[in-house]
Amino acid sequence: MEDFKIDLQLPERSQQHNFIYPLLFQEYIYALVNDRDLKRSISFANIGYEKKFRFQIVKRLINRMYKQIHWTTYFSNYSNKRKIYGLIKSLYYKLLSAGFSFLFEIPFSFKFISERKKILKSQNLRSILSIFPFFEDNFSHLKYVLDLLIPNPPHPEILVQKIRSWVQDASSLHLLQFFLQEFCSVKSLITTNKSKRNERFLFLLYNSYVCEYESFFLFLRNQSLHLGSISFVTLFERNIFYGKIECFVELFVQDSQANLRLFKDPDPSMHYARYCGKSILASNGGLLLMPKWQYYIVNFWQCYFYLWFDTERINLSQIASHPFYLMDYISSIAQTPSMVRSKMLENSFLIKNDMKIFDTFVPIIPIIGSLAKAKFCNLLGNPISKPVWSDFSDSDIIERFGRICRNLFHYYSGSSKKRSLYQIKYILRLSCARTLARKHKSTVRAFLQSLGPKFLEKFFTSEEQIIFLTFPNASFNLRGVSKGRIWYFDIVCINEQANFHVDSKFELKGYPRLKPCAMKN
C-alpha cells in the first residue's frame, strides 16, 4: 500500500482532484484485483467463459466506458442475444464491483497508514474467540448489557451520500451511483447468499455504514463523560489489517468476513464490542444511563439513515438474569458460592463468598436444528443416515464426519459445560455408522464390530487422542477429559466442511457474517 501512496502521490489529492475515476480505466487495476498474492482470488467464472481472468474482457469494458456506449441499447433490437446480454452484464458487474471496491478502499488505507505508522501484530488477537477472555476479565462486575442487532443497510444511494464525507471525487461518485442503479438492486446488496459475486462490494458499503454509526457512538460517549476517549483509531474489515493499541483492539480475519472490535473506555464501567452485525454495550451505570443510550441509538438509525428500528433488535437487560447470544455461544454471569476455611490461632471458621463468573454455554437446540437441516438427524436429535455421501469411500465418509465433530469440539471448547457436546458427538458418530451400514447393506452393530476402536478414533479431539494412544483400554470413557474451558487462538477462518451449524434462527440476515468453525485438522 505504500507503493500505491507513492504512485498516487498524497492522500489529500482525493479531496482536491478526480482521484479514483481515472484509475477505473486502467487495466492494471483489474489485474491487481485478480492477483492471488495481493488479494484472495476473485472468480469471474460460471457464466460460460473460461475460469480465469481475461484481459480481453477488461479491454472491451474499458472501451465501452471510453466511448460511453450503453450496452442495453446494443442488445435491445436482438431478441436472440438477450441471454448473451445477461451474461455479459453479469460479468461486467463483477469486474466493475471489484474495481470499485479496490479503489474505494484506498482512502481507507491512507487513513489507516497516516494514523498508524506501524502495525502492531498480535497473534492472539487474530482468533475470533479472543473476545471471550475480554468478557471474562471485564464483564463479571458489570450490571447491564445493551444487546443490539445492527439494522440492515439502507438504500444504496443513502450509503453513497455517506461515502462523500471521506471521498470527495464527484466523477467516481456519480459513476458509483449509476452503477448501483444499473446493475444492482437493494435486495442484492443487503442479502448475502452462497454466491460471493458481490461480497467485496458489499463490504465497501458496509464499512461506510458501520463507521458512521460508531463515529456517532464515540461522539456521544465523549459528550457524556468529562474525560474524552484516550485513543480511538478507525480500522476497517479487511484481511490484511489486525492490530492492538492500549485502549482499542481490532481483529481482522481471513476472507474479510468478520470484524471484532473492542473499545475499552477510560471509564472502566463501560465496554463496547461488535461482531458480525451485533453490538454489545455493557455498563455498570444506574437505571437511567442505559435507557438513554438505547434512546440515542434508536433515534440515530431512524433520523440519520431513515430506517425504522424494530424494537426486537435492541434489548436492555441485567447481565445476571438474562443471558445474551454472541458468536454461537450463550453467555451469562453466574454467581457461584465458595467456601473458604480460615484459621486464627486455635479457632477455625468458614467464610462463604459469592463470586461472579462469566459462563458460556453451547446452544444445543439450534445446533441440533442445523444438524437436522443438514440431514444428520431428525428434529428430535435422533441420528439418521446421510445417503448423499454413500458414493464416497469408507475412509472419506469417516473423515468427513470426524472432521465436523472435531471442529465443533474445537470451537466450543470454551463452554462451561461440555455435556451437550457429547450429545452432538453421539449424533454424528451414529449417523456415520448408519451411513456406512446403508452403503454396505449391513446392520449398524455388525459394521461397528468389524471396524473396532479405529472407527471411534476419528471422532476424538486432540486431548482425547493422546489418552487413546496412551491408554487404549480406557479410551471409551472420556467424559472427564477437558472439563475446564479452553479458548483456542487458531480459529481464524472458515472451514467449509463444518460451517452448517450456524444456519439457525440466530443468523443475522443481510450482513457479511463469519460462520465460525475450527481450522484445526
Curated annotation (Swiss-Prot):
Disulfide bond sites: none
InterPro entries to which the protein is assigned, alphabetical: Domain_X, Maturase_MatK, Maturase_MatK_N
A Pfam family assignment: Intron_maturas2
GO cellular component: chloroplast
Localization per Swiss-Prot or TrEMBL: Plastid
Keyword terms of this UniProt record: mRNA processing, Plastid, RNA-binding, tRNA processing
Primary residence: plastid
GO molecular function per UniProt: RNA binding
One Gene Ontology term from the biological process aspect of the record: RNA splicing
PANTHER family recorded: MATURASE K (PTHR34811:SF1)
Stored HAMAP family: MatK
Role, per record: Usually encoded in the trnK tRNA gene intron. Probably assists in splicing its own and other chloroplast group II introns.
Family: Belongs to the intron maturase 2 family. MatK subfamily.
Protein name per UniProt: Maturase K
Organism of derivation: Cuscuta exaltata
Source species taxonomy: Eukaryota, Viridiplantae, Streptophyta, Embryophyta, Tracheophyta
